[in-house]
Amino acid sequence: MTNANVDATQLTTKPSQDGFYMPAEWAAQQAVWMIWPYRPDNWRSAGAYAQATFAKVADAIGGATPVYMGVPQAFLAEAQKVMPSHVTLVEIDSNDCWARDTGPTVVVNAEGECRGVDWGFNAWGGHNGGLYFPWDKDEQVAAQMLKQHGFARYSAPLILEGGSIHVDGEGTCMTTAECLLNANRNPDLTKEQIEALLRDYLNVKQFIWLEEGVYMDETDGHIDNMCCFARPGEVVLHWTDDETDPQYPRSKAALDVLQNTVDAQGRKLKIHLLPQPGPLYCTEEESKGVTEGTGVPRTAGERLAGSYVNFLITNDRIVFPLLDPATDDIAAQKLQDIFPEHKIVGVPAREILLGGGNIHCITQQIPSGK
């Protein structure tokens, strides 16, 4: 266990000026970060079920990549009991456990040096539809993770969650208008100004804008639940053939965009369709274990934004959520077809979904650089 309570060195330049860029998720990784779940107003039984699930996810990742977990001081003893012994526990305070969204985006240069981008965070909407208050501890998470690795830090003047962007490492950024252009994120910035900041801090050239993400996604439609890059020129899209399902028009609109765009290298995209599970709904029993607080209520009968696209690529593994016995095997086979060189590892992940996300949302990779 280590302590990361000191800020990382802050830079005054921008990554693109310094020759740094965000690599694709399939680039070599030196670590993956997670954060301990404990909010009783978001996780049933004060996080007990989620903690067991996070341990399984950490174990699956640990077969390919070292895992670090940020844990508030009060929960360190409990985390040591629950987490696999290979996980490095780091004392970090947080309001909740979404490492993808509160952690840093690590950028690299041609020499293999790593630095981190620390985005602004307002709990997915601040006082205009945000998911909890306060979020002051979450705002400090990225700097503490960067300090753990000794990486210098860029502070980006943009409210942005890591789950709202995907890159191919070759100049293309994919995102959703539903999230990035939402009035509850950066209301004073135009689309062009947001693109300019992403060019500065991710060092990308081309943008693929999907209109919306997954139906009922409380993050306002994060791209990482809807569509991701599999490799340069290839994407994986959340899909349903059921034209009566509220997800269908969203996925169909996304498909239309993807079929009629090119990436930063001028390539037409190969599109893999990954079928959605369910539909899945929160049960009475599951909602009962969540206490009232400042978090968004978890209501019985509410549709869950389940998606197999919410997987993590980490070195030679794909760690993906098992969500529905009727479709889990189909998803696993499809992922194996898309990633023939990778080991496909499924982890039962309904418990993460009940809290509002999935495996990609609770992880943040640290690229090797070299």
Swiss-Prot record:
Gene Ontology terms for molecular function: agmatine deiminase activity; protein-arginine deiminase activity
Enzymatic reactions: agmatine + H2O = N-carbamoylputrescine + NH4(+)
Protein name stated in the entry: Putative agmatine deiminase
Active site (catalytic residues): 361 (amidino-cysteine intermediate)
Family that this chain belongs to: Belongs to the agmatine deiminase family.
InterPro entries: Agmatine_deiminase (IPR017754), Peptidyl-Arg-deiminase_porph (IPR007466)
Biological processes per GO annotation: putrescine biosynthetic process
HAMAP family xrefs: Agmatine_deimin (MF_01841)
Hydrolase as UniProt keyword: yes
UniProt superkingdom: Bacteria
Keywords for the protein's UniProt record, in alphabetical order: Hydrolase
EC number(s) reported in the record: 3.5.3.12
